[in-house]
Amino acid sequence: VVKVQTVAVAIASTLASSIPALAQNSELAGVREEMKQLQRNYEERMQALEKRLTEAETRAAKAEKSAGQAEQSANKAEKSATQAEETAVAAGRRTGENAFNPAISLIMQGTWARTSQDPNNFFISGFMPSGGEVGPPKRSFGLGETELSISANIDPYFRGIVIASLSPENTVAVEEAYFQTLALAQGFTLKGGRFLSGIGYQNEIHQHAWDFQDAPLPYKAFLGGRYVQDGVQLRWVAPTPFFLEVGGELASGASFPGNDLNKNGAGSTALFAHVGGDIGESYAWRTGLSYLRTSANNRSFQDPNSLGIPVTNSFTGRAKVWVVDGVLKWAPNGNSTQQNVKLQAEYFRSEQDGTLTYDDLASAAPVFGGLTDSFSSRQSGWYAQAVYQFMPRWRMGYRYDALRYGSVNNAIVNNGLGPSAADFSLLGPYNPSRNTAMIDFSPSEFSRLRLQIAQDKSRMGATDNQVFIQYIHSLGPHGAHRF
C-alpha cells in the first residue's frame, strides 16, 4: 500500500510540473503567430505605399509634361489674342471711318406680259382716274421699276434714307427721301421729308416686296396705287406687352386723292393706329384703323363724252379715306422657313365733296362749254388674299379685289345743265372686280421668280385676261421688310 501511494505521489508531482511548461509553449506559439501576422501586414502596407509612390511619381511626370504643353498653348493663345486685338483695333478704325458712309442697294425688276386688253387704255369704270401708274405692265418683255436705295446714320440722333425709282421710260423719280430720329424717348419716332404714308397695311410696303405683281384695286382707285406724303410723321409705340402703335402725319397733300394746292400750311392730315401680338408660338396678327383727309384744287382728268371726244373734267373739294386692315400669319412653332401662311385683307371707304367742272372748250367739237356744279361720292372697296409657302422657297397665293360704286351725285347731270350721264363715261355706275392667282420661287432671299394670272374686270364690258412672268433681284444690303 505504501509503495502504491509513493508511486501515485510521484506521478502526480510529475504531471503538476509539466502543465505550466505546456501552457508556456502554447503562449509562445500564439505570440510568434501574431508577430508573423504583423510582419505580413507591414509588408503589404509597404508594398501598397511603394505602389502609391510609383503612381504619384508617374502622375507628377505627366502633370509636368501637361504643364509644359499648357504653357506652350498659353503662349500661342496670348499671341493669337494679341493678333486678334490688333485686327480688332484695325477693324474698329475701318468701322469708324465707314460708320457714316451710306449703304447702297439696288432692286431690279422685269416682266413678260400677255393681256387680252390694251394696257395703254386701262381705266377703272365708275371711279375718277387717279393719274397714277395703276395699269398693267406693257405687253411682251419689259423692264419694271428699278429701285436705288441709299441709307446711313447721319449721327447718333438721325438716320437718312433716299430711294429713287428708275422707270422703264428712262425717268428718275424720288420715291422716298426722309430723315428719321434715333434717340427720341418714350417710344416716339419722328420722320420728315417724302415717305410712304403709314395708313393701311400695304401702303408702306415697297412694290418689290408685294405678294403679287400689282396693287389691289382699292389702292388703285382711292390712293393712286400707293399714298406718298411730303411732310412730317410722328409715331408712338406704347410700352405694352402687345404691339400698339399710334401715328399722325401733316403733309402737303399733293398725292391723289389730293393735289398741289399751292398754299401755306398742311394740305393733308393722316391718322393711324395699329395693334397686334402673338397667339401661342405659331400665330401672329395685326389690325389697324386709318384716316386720311386731304383737298384737291382743279384735280383734272380726261373723260370721253358721248361722242367719244376727250373732255377735260376737274374736281375741287375735300376727300376722305378710311381704311381698316388686318393680317394673320401662321408658322409652325414660329419657324417660317419650311411652311407658313399669310392672310391679308383691307377695307376702304372714300368720300368726296366739292364741285365738278365739265369743260369741252378745248375739244375738237365744243358743245356745252365750261360748266360747274356740285359733286359728291360715297364709294368703297376691299380685297382679301392668302399666300401659302408649302415648301422652302415655293409659295402660292390667291387674291380677290372688289370695288363698290356706291352713290355718286353729279349735279351737272342731275340738274339738267346739258351734259348727260353718257358724257361722263368713266363715272357711270359699275362695280369692278378681279381674281388673281400666283406662284413664285425664291432661289435665295435676294431673288424671286413669279408667275401670275388674273381675270381683271376693271373696265365695264371688257374682261382682261392677264398672264405675267416677273423677276425680282436684290443687289447689295437690304433691310428687313415690315411685318
Language-model region placement:
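Gram-negative bacterial Sec-dependent N-terminal signal peptides
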Residues: V2-L22
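Hydrophobic alpha-helical segments, especially transmembrane helices
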Residues: V4-T6, E33, M46, F195, ...
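N-terminal periplasmic/intermembrane-space "pro-region" immediately following the signal or transit peptide
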Residues: I11-S13, L22-I124, M128-G131, F243, ...
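Hydrophobic transmembrane-helix microenvironments that flank and shape a buried ionizable site
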Residues: V31, V172-A173, W322, L343
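Outer membrane beta-barrel
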Residues: A91-F256, K263-S282, L289-Y291, R378-S380, ...
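Outer-membrane beta-barrel pore domains
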Residues: G135, Y178, N203, D211, ...
